[in-house]
């Protein structure tokens, strides 16, 4: 997961891409401009141009990305936070970190204990299999 500034930069880059794509598609699909001194014959019976659909699509994409940018900006730390507030926040984070470390150490210890039990059980199983195999081999050998 990226930090907030990286997310914000990615969102701004995405918004710039959307603007460029919107301009390019609208330029490509847009109707020709009419000039007063040039006569052009345009067929009025042409099928509807998909420009309107593209305009709505890009408007929705741009609006959604702009909202995402607003949310990311609002989530950034404010300039109003004082050193005391930052220190308190850091202290709280350190406490949570120590609690998580203690919990992790406990889980690792219990995991090690379970691993030892499993290894001991596997060793017992292997020994008993070896004993049964060696016992069956000695019984199958003829006595001379």
From Swiss-Prot:
Name used for this protein in its record: Mediator of RNA polymerase II transcription subunit 21
Function text: Component of the Mediator complex, a coactivator involved in the regulated transcription of nearly all RNA polymerase II-dependent genes. Mediator functions as a bridge to convey information from gene-specific regulatory proteins to the basal RNA polymerase II transcription machinery. Mediator is recruited to promoters by direct interactions with regulatory proteins and serves as a scaffold for the assembly of a functional preinitiation complex with RNA polymerase II and the general transcription factors.
Family: Belongs to the Mediator complex subunit 21 family.
One GO location term (cellular component): mediator complex
Gene3D superfamilies: Mediator complex, subunit Med21
Keyword Transcription: yes
Pfam family, one: Med21
Cystine residue pairs: none
Superkingdom of source: Eukaryota
Keywords assigned: Activator, Nucleus, Transcription, Transcription regulation
InterPro entries listed in its UniProt record: Med7/Med21-like, Mediator_Med21
One GO term (biological process): regulation of transcription by RNA polymerase II
Intracellular or extracellular location(s): Nucleus
GO molecular function terms attached to this record: transcription coregulator activity
Subunit structure: Component of the Mediator complex, which is composed of MED1, MED4, MED6, MED7, MED8, MED9, MED10, MED11, MED12, MED13, MED13L, MED14, MED15, MED16, MED17, MED18, MED19, MED20, MED21, MED22, MED23, MED24, MED25, MED26, MED27, MED29, MED30, MED31, CCNC, CDK8 and CDC2L6/CDK11. The MED12, MED13, CCNC and CDK8 subunits form a distinct module termed the CDK8 module. Mediator containing the CDK8 module is less active than Mediator lacking this module in supporting transcriptional activation.
């Amino acid at each position: 997961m990226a930090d907030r500034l990286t997310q914000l930069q990615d969102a701004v880059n995405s918004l710039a891409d959307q603007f460029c794509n919107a301009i390019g598609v609208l330029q490509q699909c847009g109707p020709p401009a009419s000039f007063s001194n040039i006569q052009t014959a345009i067929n009025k019976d042409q099928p509807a141009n998909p420009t309107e659909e593209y305009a709505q699509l890009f408007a929705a994409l741009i609006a959604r990305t702009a909202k995402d940018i607003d949310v990311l900006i609002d989530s950034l730390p404010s300039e109003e936070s004082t050193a005391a507030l930052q220190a308190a926040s850091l202290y709280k984070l350190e406490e949570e970190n120590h609690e998580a470390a203690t919990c992790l150490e406990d889980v690792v210890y219990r995991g090690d204990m379970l691993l030892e039990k499993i290894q001991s059980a596997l060793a017992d199983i292997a020994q008993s299999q070896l004993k049964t195999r060696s016992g069956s081999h000695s019984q199958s050998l003829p006595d001379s």
